[in-house]
Amino acid sequence: MKASLPHTQSGPIGPLTPHLYMPDARRPIRAKLQRLGTDTRVVPHRHPWAQLAVSATGVVRLTVAHGTYIVPPSRALWIPPGVEHAVTVLSTADLLTLYLHQPRGRCGPQVAAAQQAAWQQCRVLEVSDLLRALALELDATADGAGPPLSADALRREGRLCALVLDELRRALPVPLGVDLPADKRLRALCEAVLAEPGRHTTLEGWARDCGASPRTVARLFRSELGTSFVQWRQQVLLARAVALAARRMPMAAIAAELGYASPSAFSAMVRRSVGATPSRFLGS
């Protein structure tokens, strides 16, 4: 790792200094490394370049206007230019942020024009061992105030950047995003489910908590998110399972935490949802 980590930060963080890490054609990828304590909150912000958030250790949650994403060490989140986002640390994390130069009118890790649409949305990606190693080799400082790079260091950084972009283009998307509504009533219910998804297993239980009828809540899910409560909650459970697995929680304990009667019932849900075994999906 090219930079020593600073002391652990906690609580709300802001104002930010993204200009210190601004990428450009000469240095197309800039890296920032921070150690953030549990419950640290980074204020909503945006910047005119793309971002790849990689949790080297720990688990973070990134929230945008219409969704939230869980990022454990085996995954990363791509954030397109101009998208406002906030960060909440779920367990103490070494957060490596890559800022990527995006030429005018382009979006993505130097992909063909026909592939750019997929990169204009936030997406969770698998992080290969090679991508992680390359990203950690980039020159990273906690405050962007490192000394100027030598000519040899700049050439090496250029080669590393090319390899990072190549690995990023090959990274597979993972369904760990959870859509969030604009309606305040439904948003409050969704935040409650995200905070404690195993509290209730039925729509009736959650509707009772928020003082609305199940029919009203079901209608709001359809009109606001275009999905059913059951389908939406399933995405929450998948995201929470990944976060728990990153803390090395056993499969049986994860199943119980999420309200499943048995590990086999939880495994069946994962296979049905993502077409992969729990161990493969959870990165364990």
Q: Language-model segments: what does each one mean?
A:
Residues 1-14, 246-247, 268-284:
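…primarily DNA-binding HTH/wHTH and HhH modules…
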Residues 1-60:
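Generic protein-terminus/edge-of-domain signal
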Residues 82-110:
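Ligand-binding loop in jelly-roll beta-barrel domains
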Residues 200, 204, 223-263, 283-284:
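Terminal helix-turn-helix DNA-binding modules in bacterial transcription factors
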Residues 208, 219, 223, 256-257, ...:
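Alpha-helical residues within the helix-turn-helix
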